[in-house]
């Protein structure tokens, strides 16, 4: 019977065949231990010399790392294993032998591993991170579908940008200029006027020359837009969404979190409502904490965000930033028109902003004024202005960066490990 490592638990004390790769092995004179993986998990295969043909034991000692195999044997309980079971191997068939696999079981530098990312993905920890990424995506669809959102796919090639063009990748679109999208927001706002609540999930591109552990050039973003929704209601949806994702990973990725040695007690504390602190109060807090490199009207850097989030030891909303440091489409704060109705959700443990969101300007005259103030081409944004001409309503939206969120939940140091093939400032290969 052919099965997988994950499904093997349903076949205790039965003989099965599993297609797998050999990740590592060790042997003595009478027994060989094979570390096997098949994409669904990692399992140990035990080959006892006295219980198999001589050729099988000889093969078990000689097969090379990352060779592909069909392994047949009996699934038995093993309480020492993370899985709780292993295979007593009876026969081995080599599908393809690997020669001189470059990522041997020893320490390698980051650049070497990134050069071999196509192979590094096979390692146990990288496999665990990708499984957590997958669960975050699954839980995202689950949340939005249950809450009545419609999925909309905005274009990746655009003629205009939500936040100006300084950080956009330019390309030619036949005889026109085009840019790789840095957000689907403007299109989602249009879709929200048709469907009420919409979300998207897709790649975004930022031509930022950043080399921090938080930044990728290409990353995936989950964006939501909601009609007839105010800023406070939007924050509630955001915190419910993040809480749902964290709980789903805790429930469905226990083994992966264990492999990554993640301190799950920090994630177990994540619950609604999240703390909220205004930009004004955050500036005062930082001053009291000894930060003398930040003044009102300046954006926060990584050390500032980390200090604020670590104070709460939870995700925290920083609300109502100054108008002058935020994009043109954000609604003024009626209590202080030098600020806007927006919030950044900052993850604890130094992972930084994972969500940016705001209430959108819904008044045509104000939006036209903002477009001019920001030096944007009114013609390029005519479709966006139309949304305010024909039945404008209060509406809000937000975007969550997938890779940064996965980094926080999984506890990995650098965001590059949360994308299968990350695009960094100096890396376009593989």
Curated annotation (Swiss-Prot):
Signal peptide: none annotated. It is found in: Cytoplasm. One of its GO terms (molecular function) is catalytic activity, acting on a protein. Its EC number is 6.1.1.22. It comes from the Bacteria. GO terms for biological process: asparaginyl-tRNA aminoacylation. PROSITE patterns: AA_TRNA_LIGASE_II. GO terms for cellular component: cytoplasm. It catalyses: tRNA(Asn) + L-asparagine + ATP = L-asparaginyl-tRNA(Asn) + AMP + diphosphate + H(+). Belongs to the class-II aminoacyl-tRNA synthetase family. Homodimer. HAMAP family: Asn_tRNA_synth (MF_00534). This is Asparagine--tRNA ligase. The lineage of its organism: Bacteria, Bacillati, Bacillota, Bacilli, Bacillales. The gene is asnS.
């Amino acid at each position: 019977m052919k099965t997988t490592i994950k499904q093997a638990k349903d076949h205790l004390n039965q003989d099965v065949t599993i297609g797998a790769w050999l990740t590592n092995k060790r042997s003595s004179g009478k027994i060989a231990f094979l570390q096997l993986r098949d994409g669904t998990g990692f399992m140990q295969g035990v080959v006892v010399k006295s219980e198999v043909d001589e050729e099988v034991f000889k093969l078990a000692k000689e097969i090379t790392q990352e060779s592909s195999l069909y392994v047949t044997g009996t699934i038995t309980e093993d309480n020492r294993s993370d899985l709780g079971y292993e295979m007593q191997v009876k026969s081995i068939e080599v599908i393809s032998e690997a020669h001189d696999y470059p990522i041997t079981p020893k320490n390698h530098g980051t650049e070497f591993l990134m050069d071999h990312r196509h192979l590094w993905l096979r390692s146990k920890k990288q496999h665990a991170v990708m499984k957590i990424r997958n669960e975050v995506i699954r839980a995202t669809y689950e949340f939005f579908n249950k809450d009545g959102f419609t999925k909309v796919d905005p274009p990746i090639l655009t003629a205009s940008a939500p936040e100006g063009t300084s950080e956009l990748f330019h390309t030619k679109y036949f005889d026109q200029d085009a840019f790789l999208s840095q957000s689907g927001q403007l299109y989602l706002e249009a879709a929200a006027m048709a469907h009420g609540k919409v979300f998207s999930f897709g790649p975004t591109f930022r031509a930022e020359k950043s080399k921090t552990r938080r930044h990728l050039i290409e990353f995936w973003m989950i964006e939501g837009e909601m009609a007839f929704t105010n800023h406070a209601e939007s924050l509630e949806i955001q915190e419910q969404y993040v809480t749902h994702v964290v709980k789903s990973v805790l429930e469905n990725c226990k083994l992966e979190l264990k492999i990554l040695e993640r301190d799950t007690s920090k994630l177990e504390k994540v619950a609604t409502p999240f703390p909220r602190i205004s930009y004004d109060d955050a500036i005062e807090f930082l001053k009291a904490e000894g930060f003398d490199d930040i003044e009102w009207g300046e954006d926060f850097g990584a050390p500032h965000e980390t200090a604020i989030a670590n104070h709460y030891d939870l995700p925290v909303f920083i609300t109502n930033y100054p108008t002058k440091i935020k994009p043109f489409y954000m609604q003024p704060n009626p209590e202080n028109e030098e600020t806007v109705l927006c919030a950044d959700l900052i993850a604890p443990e130094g992972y930084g902003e994972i969500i940016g969101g705001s209430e959108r300007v819904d008044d045509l005259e104000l939006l036209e004024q903002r477009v001019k103030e920001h030096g944007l081409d009114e013609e390029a944004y005519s479709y966006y202005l139309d949304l305010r001409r024909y039945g404008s309503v209060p509406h809000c939206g937000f975007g969550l960066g997938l890779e940064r969120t996965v980094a926080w939940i999984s506890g990995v140091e650098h965001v590059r490990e949360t994308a299968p093939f990350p695009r960094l400032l100096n890396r376009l290969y593989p």
